[in-house]
Amino acid sequence: MPSQVNKAAFEVGRNLGITPGSVVFRNELLELIQYQPTTEQVHTRPVLVVPPQINKFYVFDLSPDKSLARFTLDSGLQTFIISWRNPTRQQSHWDLNRYIEALKEAVDAVLAITGSADLNMLGACSGGVTATALLGHYAALGDQRVKALTLMVSVLDTDVDTQYSLFVDDKTLDAAKRRSSEAGVLEGRDLARVFAWLRPNDLIWNYWVNNYLLGNLPPEFDILYWNNDTTRLPAGLHHDLIELFRQNPLRTPGALEVCGTPIDLKTIEAEIFCVAGTTDHITPWQASYNSAR
């Protein structure tokens, strides 16, 4: 695969992810970063951001002018962002339930630190699916500690045709599960390669022409640096996400059990706001719209 970005132009902590913050909680699966307020007064209710497990947290803090963290801080919000641990084959057993339990601990930590009775959450991609499942679990327990949830490019209802689904059948999904079972993890670069082939003109041949035919350096583009700075998924979570895609259980009340409770998304009382990208080839806006419904 041709390089999409000049990696020498970026470094986390130098020109990426530079908003001041500290790790205030840690468990086996995640670190919780609390960012320093930029206003004299802050809102009581904090916001907790849940990134996708296959990518790194600093997509929400790329640069001062492209930083959700800085925007929320300047808006007077107490801001926390999760950084997921990069698993190895020793953590192959980590599944959706384990990630939700870890997220529950992070929620408890945020509430304990801020003294707030509840919080708002923002989840992106698989992080949004994880956050939604947690809210379903809370709803089953009668727990209202999440006031509002924002979902960014998160698919809860997989009953929609996408470019990705055109290449996927049971045989392909079973083969993917076998591969991650053997390795213990799914390498992020393998998943990125699959997604790139969904838009080959933009994400492959464009760079082939630029890098090899024209002899130019790859461009300096912060979001592409982040997109290429992948992590791994443990086999357990990979298998669960495949079955969510295949069986679409979140659509049917009680079809999915999380942490010992059946999930019914209709019982969630938190306000939910869904965001989609009009040109997103991985999570088309129609899929996010179905989730909102």
Which residues does each predicted region cover?
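Mobile cap/lid helix-loop segments that gate and shape the active-site cleft of serine hydrolases
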Residues: N227-I263, A270
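Alpha/beta-hydrolase fold nucleophile elbow
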Residues: V107-G127
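Alpha/beta-hydrolase active-site loop
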Residues: Q91-T114
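Short beta-strand/loop motif that positions the catalytic acidic residue
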Residues: I268, C274-A276, D280
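Alpha/beta-hydrolase-fold enzymes
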Residues: A112, S116, T130, L134-H238
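Short, surface-exposed "cap/lid" segments of acyl-processing enzymes
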Residues: M1-T88
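Conserved alpha/beta-hydrolase "acid-adjacent" motif
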Residues: H281-A287
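Active-site-adjacent structural elements in folded domains
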Residues: L16-I18, P64-K66, R89-W94, Y207-W208, ...
